[in-house]
Amino acid sequence: MKRDLYETLGVKKNADEKELKSAFRKLAMKYHPDRNPGDQEAEKSFKEINEAYETLKDPQKRAAYDRYGHAAFEQGGMGAGFGNGFAGGSAGGFSDIFEDIFGEMMGGRQRRSSGGRERGADLRYNMEITLEEAYSGKTAQIRVPTSVTCDVCTGSGAKPGTSPKTCATCQGSGRIRAAQGFFSIERTCPTCGGRGQTITDPCTKCHGQGRVTEERTLSVNIPTGIEDGTRIRLSGEGEAGLRGGPAGDLYIFLSVKPHEFYQRDGADLYCSVPISMTTAALGGKFDVTTLDGTKSRVTVPEGTQAGKQFRLKGKGMPVLRSNQTGDLYIQIQIETPQKLTKRQRELLQEFEQISSKENNPQSTGFFSRMKDFFDTLSE
């Protein structure tokens, strides 16, 4: 028993033309024989969805099907006049949508130029650099294994003194058409593999491919201020094209190593610096080494608290392709003394005894406010 045509396309019986076309496009891409070589079930499904769409997209045929079902198109049936040839104007409509749907799928044909030339594949190279290198920029030498144009046949794939011949099967188009019922399907030519040419006497070095594998050394310019995850494109430095086709591109994917002291946020840098409790209380100075190798002095005022930030203007990262520079932020961490001697402990205890609320206004105020808060709740 034949399947319901609406069920075949996966649409409701009141589906409009737009819904029918969308469903057909999706299913045709899924079951097309070129995407399922040798799969008889897929080929059967492909024929069914084409038959369903061709029927339902035509208002007269759809009306007949809605009234009589499949009997409308059977010989001698109630709607036999509609037939199964789909001749006349309807064929053009199917051809248009067929080309529209499979134009993208036949992209391999579009990538090939005359003579079976194909563009080479793009390559990816992962490079890791230091934060210092991202700061100052550099020129790096990299070695990339890739396919390059054969120097014996100059990319033609044919033995010197000979040349490729136009494929007799497809007449150089790289595609052949095969009739299937009321429509024809375009396939890759099995003789030339879609190249449009055949090589009877291939080059002995590249074996007819027009390219060979080797390792190349390339120079890569890393600009100042480059960020983690940046992609650099080297046009034409990918794999050589097949049979004299254009080369692909090489993409350098950069990653910046984590730094031992600095964290980066855009063009700004951050550094946490531990200082002693006495330096925080009495004040002091210390030097930090910036990414350009110079030293910058940071002055710590008396009574500096943990988390205090000091901004060193213009000491951050260069902004890519500009004259601007970010800032460096120094965040203070106060280190609590450990492994105290007896004398140190005595001095700290004495200091605690002679301290007043004014010496620790934040902690005194905090505990006072906490006590008042909970006292209010208990009333």
Swiss-Prot record:
Instruction: Provide the residue positions that the database annotates as binding Zn(2+) 2.
Output: 167, 170, 189, 192
Q: Does the keyword Chaperone apply?
A: yes
This protein's assembly is summarised as: Homodimer.
Q: Which GO terms describe its molecular function?
A: ATP binding; heat shock protein binding; unfolded protein binding; zinc ion binding
Q: Which family does it belong to?
A: Belongs to the DnaJ family.
Lineage of the organism: Bacteria, Pseudomonadati, Pseudomonadota, Alphaproteobacteria, Hyphomicrobiales
Q: Report the domain remarks.
A: The J domain is necessary and sufficient to stimulate DnaK ATPase activity. Zinc center 1 plays an important role in the autonomous, DnaK-independent chaperone activity of DnaJ. Zinc center 2 is essential for interaction with DnaK and for DnaJ activity.
Query: By what name is this protein known?
Result: Chaperone protein DnaJ
Q: Which organism is it from?
A: Sinorhizobium fredii (strain NBRC 101917 / NGR234)
The job of this chain, per UniProt, is described as: Participates actively in the response to hyperosmotic and heat shock by preventing the aggregation of stress-denatured proteins and by disaggregating proteins, also in an autonomous, DnaK-independent fashion. Unfolded proteins bind initially to DnaJ; upon interaction with the DnaJ-bound protein, DnaK hydrolyzes its bound ATP, resulting in the formation of a stable complex. GrpE releases ADP from DnaK; ATP binding to DnaK triggers the release of the substrate protein, thus completing the reaction cycle.
User: Where primarily located?
Assistant: cytoplasm
Which stretches are zinc fingers (CR-type)? 137-215
GO terms for CC?
A: cytoplasm
Alphabetically list the UniProt keywords. Answer: Chaperone, Cytoplasm, DNA replication, Metal-binding, Repeat, Stress response, Zinc, Zinc-finger
InterPro entries, sorted: DnaJ, DnaJ_C, DnaJ_domain, DnaJ_domain_CS, HSP40/DnaJ_pept-bd, HSP_DnaJ_Cys-rich_dom, HSP_DnaJ_Cys-rich_dom_sf, J_dom_sf
Q: Which residues bind Zn(2+) 1?
A: 150, 153, 203, 206
CDD domains registered for this protein in UniProt:
DnaJ, DnaJ_C, DnaJ_zf
Compartment annotation: Cytoplasm
Presence of keyword Zinc-finger: yes
Required cofactors, per record? Zn(2+)
Q: Where is the J domain?
A: 4-69
The alphabetized list of GO BP terms reads: chaperone cofactor-dependent protein refolding; DNA replication; protein refolding; response to heat
User: How the cofactor binds, per note?
Assistant: Binds 2 Zn(2+) ions per monomer.
State the encoding gene.
dnaJ
